[in-house]
Design a protein with these regions (language model features):
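N-terminal/domain-start alpha-helical segments
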Residues: 1-122
Length: 124
């Protein structure tokens, strides 16, 4: 599995990348929407998407990707805890939504779950 991590926080980005590697999952970590657009074209198996980014709003990019037909599973990871943010993320096309701080084991489980669902839907 190959994951695109879009997270502007350096400590969290490095921790996510290291944790995924320990699980045998490869990944690319980027800190901006501009960088992410280049890697989205490489079709990762899943995207971990922060909402508050230095060059824009992750939710708006999520909606744009979905409108363009980008079907790769996307898990939103954010410090925003309001119900409206969770609903907006899921309605905007996220496959899952996880608020920070979170346990890495939970993220890994959710990552496997969304990629399994995606693979099952693709085979139907």
């Amino acid at each position: 599995m190959h994951v695109l991590i879009l997270e502007d926080d350096i400590d969290l980005g490095q921790a996510l990348l290291a944790s995924l590697r320990l699980e045998g999952i490869s990944g690319v970590w980027v800190r901006s929407l501009r960088e992410a657009d280049a890697f989205v074209a490489e079709a990762p198996d899943c995207v971990l998407l922060d909402l508050a980014l230095p060059d824009g709003e992750g939710l708006e990019r999520l909606r744009r990707w979905r409108e363009a037909g980008y079907g790769v599973p996307i898990i939103v990871i954010t410090a925003r805890t309001a119900l409206e943010d969770r609903v907006s993320g899921l309605d905007g096309g996220a496959d899952d939504f996880l608020t920070k701080p979170f346990a890495m084991a939970e993220l890994i489980s959710r990552l496997h779950a969304v990629t399994r669902r995606h693979a099952r839907q693709a085979s139907e």
